[in-house]
Amino acid sequence: MTQTSQRPLRVLAAMSGGVDSAVAAARAAEAGHDVTGVHLALSANPQSFRTGARGCCTIEDSRDARRAADVIGIPFYVWDLAERFREDVVEDFVAEYEAGRTPNPCLRCNEKIKFAALLDKALALGFDAVCTGHYATVVLAEDGSRELHRASDMAKDQSYVLGVLDEKQLAHAMFPLGDTLTTKDEIRAEAERRGLAVAKKPDSHDICFIADGDTQGFLANRLGGPAEGDILDESGTKLGTHEGAFGFTIGQRKGLKIGHPAPDGKPRYVLDISPVNNTVTVGPVEALDVTALTAIKPRWCGTPPSGPGTYTAQLRAHGGESEVTAELVDGTELNVTFTEPVRGVAPGQAVVLYDGTRVVGSATIATTVRRERVATGG
């Protein structure tokens, strides 16, 4: 059954300044909980964050959150977590790209900020739970444990970016939007009925701490400027140059400066990134097919699996599901084999395992196994 409370709780509502978190806070207050709103200041220089429609952590967003709290009728505070965010999210993002991996900063923010730094402070101040506008569901199992499940509306489900949470964190998590089969237009209509000015505010997208959306430029600035290197084909032949291998991700097609079309006339995609050699290897789309992967740093939403099992896996925040078999090795590595090959799997991404709608756990992809290709031509 869905997690319910027999008594009003002291709830700290994380309010980003967007419509989802505002409606979530309003629903929590309407349910009878003692709600306090908080906006997280995540940068010593808010101008470095995206502003307007595409932001989530700017001065403008803080003002929107405060206005929403005033309408709801709850106390509101701004908490400075800029240094923690810099260390745990921004620096991690830079280090992962420098190593040739593809991080997910939103997932890391949930793990290290919203349900660690924020939750720890909330519990220390006597709050019972942290409420957010995520679309996911916490379920109270028959044995009394908490389980994380997909949202009722799969189209809006955000359980992937919450797959790093453990049972202790889930016991203090509240997701008021996850249970309802409401469209985003209906959420906006509800916000408008409640008098919330953010009702028509567009959703945030992209990476909040890169103000202009230029990930390559951001990384070049942090890592000492562009360093020209070679773009190679699978045989090692030079096809072109790049301005820094650290800005690419597996499966990328755009931004490849290749001097001439491939012999087969087909587009080329990033297959491999070598920070040591500062090279990027490209190839045809079928070369991206992955049959298995090994993932590290597993985190479980409950008891770890005791042996091999069959699950569905999700590899990206908005990706589809894949049938897999998975086995935990020595408690530290997760070996995952796909029933059918999948494309564009990048080290650094999270693989999240599901048993039906229930999140089993997640781990960080370390290595992949590509499908063998049969040579053709004559």
Swiss-Prot record:
Gene3D superfamilies: Adenine nucleotide alpha hydrolases-like domains, HUPs, Translation factors
Catalytic reaction equation(s): S-sulfanyl-L-cysteinyl-[protein] + uridine(34) in tRNA + AH2 + ATP = 2-thiouridine(34) in tRNA + L-cysteinyl-[protein] + A + AMP + diphosphate + H(+)
Function: Catalyzes the 2-thiolation of uridine at the wobble position (U34) of tRNA, leading to the formation of s(2)U34.
UniProt similarity note: Belongs to the MnmA/TRMU family.
Gene that this sequence comes from: mnmA
GO biological process, alphabetically ordered: tRNA wobble position uridine thiolation
GO molecular function, one term: tRNA-uridine 2-sulfurtransferase activity
Organism: Streptomyces griseus subsp. griseus (strain JCM 4626 / CBS 651.72 / NBRC 13350 / KCC S-0626 / ISP 5235)
UniProt keyword annotations, A-Z: ATP-binding, Cytoplasm, Disulfide bond, Nucleotide-binding, RNA-binding, Transferase, tRNA processing, tRNA-binding
Record: active site: 109, 208
Keyword Acyltransferase in record: no
Site feature: Interaction with tRNA: 134, 349
Domain of life, per lineage: Bacteria
Annotated transmembrane regions: none
Binding of ATP, residues: 14-21, 40, 133
Disulfide bond entries: 109-208
Cellular compartments annotated: Cytoplasm
Stated name of the protein: tRNA-specific 2-thiouridylase MnmA
EC number: 2.8.1.13
Region listing for Interaction with tRNA, in residue ranges: 156-158
GO cellular component, one term: cytoplasm
